[in-house]
Amino acid sequence: MIIMRKIYFTLIALLASINMFAQGWPANYSGVMLQGFSWDSYDYSQWTVLEKQADDMKGFIDLVWLPQSGKCIETTQVMGYKPYYYFNQNSSFGTEAELRSLIAKFKANGIGAIADVVVNHRNTDGWFTFPAETYNGVTYKMLPTDICKNDDGGATAKQATKDGVSLSNNNDEGQDWDGCRDLDHKSANVQKIIKAYLKFLKEDIGYTGFRYDMVKGFSGSHVADYNDATGVKFSVGEYWDGNPSIINWINKTNKKSAAFDFQFRYNVRDAVNGAADGKVASFSDWSKLNSTNNLMHDANYRQYAVTFVENHDMQYRSASEPLDPLRKDTLAANAYMLAMPGTPCIFQPHWRAYKQELKSMIEARKLAGITNMSNYTNKMAQTSCFANETTGNKAKLIVVVGNNTKAYTPSADYAQILEGYHYRYYLSKSAETAWCNIPSGEYEAGFKAKLTAVSQNSNAKLVYTTDGTAPTAKSKQVTTGSTINIDNTCTLKVGLLINGNVTGIRTYNYTIKAFEPYTI
């Protein structure tokens, strides 16, 4: 009987362990992701440059999606979307040693690195030659028979006939891409090599999760298989299509991967532009945010929604390659995204341009306890003003965006904590917390910080210190809405003072580094 009970509990533990890795993206996840690169961002996205930013990201950014880190066959700088080597991790963004150092620094700061996994296709030397790579005593080499029979619209088959080479007997399972050889994911050799590659990325290099590129090119069932083989906790696929197709792909992975919420992005673009399909009207139409055409709105799929408002395939590149960027209201777009369920992914150029504002939005999101599965209610949907209330597991957060944010005023149960160009945040007073509108970080000069008492007690005051000690009833005292001067590097601690008791303390670490002129 004792033996049977041990077997039973062992099986239960095993099933629980398997199930833990079967969701593709954690339930009730409160993290925020940063896309750590943009197109041709070879300077800003060097591993050494990103490593220096890890301390500043701590507490705000939980995951950083890195550019494809494997070595390519080209000798010039490339973004990595035509992969050649899998086990050689020296790229246009730095050496393998620098990559390992970056990922270790991220982990020390509570940040996970997401690998850009490009396995729909692979580059070759000539038409058919893949590299032979040896890792842990095993040599891995793909063959011409690992290339889809109808690759490159049949051009590869014609060349194979000319060269006397045999391709796979299987056609491509999805969309063809003529930039490289499309891999046959039904091939046992392809599956073996990709699984070894992904285990190498996770277990050796130290990546926390995977972003799968161009998953329209092969069946989602293979993503499920690869994730099962590696036991990865975070997986997101780039299925660039309409909402029904994205949901269908998630289902094909057996919900073992999240997906980028492209329709959420298009909702935001159309609201900002005031028109659909990338056109720009005279005025924005914020009511377009009131859409059910996205993953984020669906309670059955918002866990798997990675929301974004712009990425490297949409950003403005040049006059000859303008693509489909946000034309305006970048801050308001991000304010909306960061107040909503799903896992928000901030674009690196936005982070660089508006880091202070985005940090405050993230702080508000986390203070309210908003997760990828939180529920929300629309409060107003007008052309010039849109408001949603999201219920976190700690408090409620109302986001108001539009050309006339004053058109919506919440009840007295809310306190305004943030205001910027075409956006406002209101936090429910049930949060019972102090708030400062300037987030932790490094600044080039002193500044004024506004303190707010978010409390149901109308008599609540604020007490604060700037020496890192916990504030008491005898500390400096101000009323809600007051501003204080921060002129030097310090640790601000501010709390609510109610009936002689101090609660809801928030901590802000400020480094003031005056700009030092230099000769060019």
Where are these regions (language model features)?
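Positively charged n-region of N-terminal signal peptides that target proteins for export
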Residues: 1-7
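Cleavable N-terminal signal peptides
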Residues: 10, 20-21
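Active-site-proximal helices and loops of the catalytic beta/alpha 8
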Residues: 23-39, 49-58, 68-70, 74-82, ...
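Aromatic- and acidic-residue-enriched carbohydrate-binding clefts of CAZyme catalytic domains
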Residues: 29-31, 72-104, 134-184
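Substrate-binding cleft of carbohydrate-active enzyme catalytic domains
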Residues: 95-131, 135
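Alpha-helical scaffold elements lining the catalytic groove of polysaccharide deacetylases
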Residues: 185-197
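Short, compositionally stereotyped local motifs that mark structural "simplifiers"
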Residues: 429-520
